[in-house]
Amino acid sequence: MSLTSAYQLKLAEKLTILNDRGQGVLIRMYNIKKTCSDSKSKPPFLLEKSMESCLKYINKKFPNIDVRNSTQHLGPVHREKAEIIRFLTNYYQSFVDVMEFRDHVYELLNTIDACQCHFDINLNFDFTRSYLDLIVTYTSVILLLSRIEDRRILIGMYNCAHEMLHGHSDPSFARLGQMVLEYDHPLKKLTEEFGPHTKAVSGALLSLHFLFVRRNQGAEQWRSAQLLSLISSPPAMINPANSDTMACEYLSVEVMERWIIIGFLLCHGCLNSNSQCQKLWKLCLEGSLYITLIREDVLQVHKVTEDLFSSLKGYSKRVADIKESKEHAITNSGQFHCQRRQFLRTAVKELETVLNDEPGLLGPKALFAFMALSFIRDEVTWLVRHTENVTKTKTPEDYADSSIAELLFLLEEIRALVRRHIKVIQQYHLQYLARFDVLVLSDIIQNLSVCPEEESVIMSSFVSILSSLNLKQVDNEEKFDFSGLRLDWFRLQAYTSVSKAPLHLHENPDLAKVMNLIIFHSQMLDSVEKMLVETSDLSTFCFHLRTFEKMFATTLEEPTMLRYTIAFPLICAHFVHCVHEMCPEEYPHLKNHGLHHCNSFLEDLAKQTSNCVLEICAEQRNLNEQLLPKHCATTISKAKNKKSMKQRQAPRKGEPERDKPGAESHRKNRSLVTNMDKLHLNLTELALAMNHVHSFSVFEHTIFPSEYLSSHLEARLNRAIVTLAGYNATTQEILRPSELLAGVKAYISFIQSLAQFLGADASRIVRNALLQQTQPLDSSGEQTVTTLYTNWYLESLLRQASSGAIVLSPAMQAFISLPRDGEQNFSAEEFSDISEMRALAEILGPYGMKFLSENLMWHVTSQIVELKKLVVENMDILVQIRSNFSKPELMASLLPQLTGAENVLKRMTIIGVILSFRAMAQEGLQEVFSAHCPFLMGPIECLKEFVTPDTDIKVTLSVFELACAAGVSCDIDPALVAAIANLKADNSSPEEEYKVACLLLIFLAVSLPLLATDPSSFFSIEKDGYNNNIHCLTKAIIQVSAALFTLYNKNIETHLKEFLVVASVSLLQLGQETDKLKTRNRESISLLMRLVVEESPFLTLDMLESCFPYVLLRNAYREVSRAFYLNRLPASSH
């Protein structure tokens, strides 16, 4: 073939186009195979019962299907022909693409044979690689086609529908059907077709021999050669890493294995005639049990080769070689690759450390980075495909690696390092190209003995392009593009590799060497990202998800590997490289796989990290709990009740000495590892993983690992705080607020101390968690401590206070439990004193306290509703009493007619107890708010001072609402006003409601004397209150009155004066009562009048003096005091 025709044949261009096209066709075949093997995605026609007979008929008669005379068999197809055409067109066209691809491949292979091209991976690398890639791709397409079980049905059904619709078969069907039949036994047919190409294929493969042997060395040989080491020879550290064929140094061993196995499988004739071919083939058979066709589709090397060769004459020795190689691979390959992975972990870690410390070395030693990536990728992919396919083995440990995460992490680290310092790489290689490569190339071109015009033009353009480079292009961040130069070199390789070329590349190896060097240097300027994909793409995991997940789970169980777990979500970013433009329908599925697994891995990592954090928090809380004041009681007791030295030296058996706080830090030996040590170690490793990268992209989605950790920590902290409260709905047990607060502070202080290590916003986590705890439900709909404490105080403490088991002691500023038969499950004073109320306010915050108030007010309003009913029942009598309260004779007849007076007092007392508790909670809130926000508390108090009785009521309530939110007490309770306003009146007018409110005060006033009959109505000086909580009546009377008359826009003071007058008259009339039972605690009840005045901002002692003489109060105090001290004297002193 003439040189002119060699130029016109465009071998380089055709190889480039056909290889890309072949990958697309291969992926389409894979997609059809995958789709048809899954009943969920299979074409619906293949699953319909009515189609079964049609499908059997088409499969049996294929490709000679008589559509016109087979209506009884193809009736269902005829009915749905349009739908079948619409649905199966893509499938059919994909098979047609295979046929057309086959035609073009054979045309090109025959042309290359005719040109008698010379292939040598060390010289014409691109030409040889493209040639071998095309053969492997074509073989993979045919093998995958033969693995599609429904191929005949898909093609035959489409053609039947096409003929029914258009009256004739599809033009491609006859050839397509014949091709499908021919490749029912694909390898047999392929070996026949490739017989004429044996010389070219074997020549290309033999050029791999030296390279494959060198790249297939064991870990010991690598170690001896100090492979990938930059520090083994310090003087040569900055020398550029060069090779005669740079691309061969990072060429994948997996790719070479695929070339050799499939090449010799198709062109097996040379194995019997050429000992070098035989050696290379046997060496390759000893390396792997499986090679990849595409994604997870593999070729079982030894079985397939043995089956083929067994059917051929004269191949008995080769079959024996296969069996021997298989046994060697099973016995040794697992350990061989295991040792290489161990070596790479050490060597690449050293390389990454040096390059990270001195990134300038990435200039001269960039090749080392890509070699490291390629070596790691080869070992990982070998492990993955063998783990997936070798199911029965005596040595399963050969196909499992608990330390694989470290290799994956190092791969990601090298990739990140190259990306981060790409400018360093560009600056170095630009200078190399412009100041060295171009000079060497010029010398070589000038020394060529023969240089045809076409080749001369191409090489002159190389010199021109390289001479124009300057450093400003890198500084100005110009985009480089040397794709034209590389394609020209590919063309030049093709031109100089044909047999009749005037300029032969194999006769001018120096030209090949310098051009291969130039190609690598040009890639360092414009194709670094492509190089990273070529050498380190691990998108294979997208199709080995079970193995991927298993590796991740194994890594989580290995404490020393935890820091490398971030590599797994980072590798999900590789999945985007699986996409091919000829199969766009795959994109959503690949995207879902990538995002789902990335999300799953990060969720598991965040979950494990948050679990570890919360476990340490729990330990810190336990240590903090040991320092609580309650635990020093035993120490104080022992110190107080010291006995003899002997007794102290010999403590009783069964009474172990309690460890003092801090004892956990004492160690006799540092090798003793505590649970806390293990947790801290695990947390350190996990924190390194979660904080390794700020963000990364997966299929155009930006992923922030810290956000996963933040959300998990927030949720776990929420649950932990609720768990700390220790609420038991059955026994109504709960932790004291002060103890819960101490525990929460221990949790928070530890989490905040981790802020710089976790990479998460600790302040935001804590803030959000605590804020959610101030709401009734958290973000996941679970109960919070606000709900738990609100329910507990209402259902336990206040309910028992209403029944008289618990008493409010103003002297102690707490509720206290009264001694009763049977043990109480809690002590009221431990949950309601000043410190506890302050702690409660600290935990619940203003929002939580508002929720508590709203619940308290609901209970108050429910009592008010009942009180209104009682007033309405006694309306007529109360109206008369209100008019005639100063007439003793008439009152004596009216009072007995009242019903439910005791009920009124009881319900009003309950309201008073609730409001008293709320007041205590508000005081706690005020103290906390003042401590946290003094700059806010000042203006709020100042604003409250500006409110006068003349201020508009809406403005007043708004200001009071603000003040109440900060815990400041107000003359009128806005929460109570709002709660009463929300009560639904039974079609009653405001005037009637107002009348009921007035009569309620009258009812209370005339009912007060009834309290004197209750033995519990004795005023206790010690408690500064009554054992039946009637001192809470005063708060109820004042606050309910203020709320009611504010609501009805009436004068509060006037109505409270009326109450004072009526109550005074009622109590004064009690003084004339002769029945001792009715006057039993008259003096104690009289004191209520003073308590009412003290409680109210609207009443004064002068007002009280005008209707109830102060002398009576003074006498009452004296009598109550005398009776109290008499009761405390021992019985013998009476």
Swiss-Prot record:
Annotated compartments: Membrane; Cytoplasm
InterPro entries in the record: Nck-associated_protein-1
Pfam families according to UniProt: Nckap1
Coiled coil location: none
Keywords noted in UniProt: Cytoplasm, Membrane, Transmembrane, Transmembrane helix
Phenotype of the disrupted gene, per the record: Mutants exhibit lymphopenia, neutrophilia and anemia. T cell development is disrupted at the CD4(-)CD8(-) to CD4(+)CD8(+) cell stages and T cell activation and adhesion are impaired. Neutrophils fail to migrate in response to chemotactic agents and are deficient in their ability to phagocytose bacteria. They show enhanced Th17 cells production. The anemia is microcytic, hypochromic and characterized by abnormally shaped erythrocytes with aberrant F-actin foci and decreased lifespan.
TM annotation in the entry: 999-1019
Region (Disordered): 638-671
Gene Ontology annotations of biological process type: actin polymerization-dependent cell motility; B cell homeostasis; B cell receptor signaling pathway; chemotaxis; cortical actin cytoskeleton organization; erythrocyte development; erythrocyte homeostasis; intracellular signal transduction
Name the UniProt record assigns to this protein: Nck-associated protein 1-like
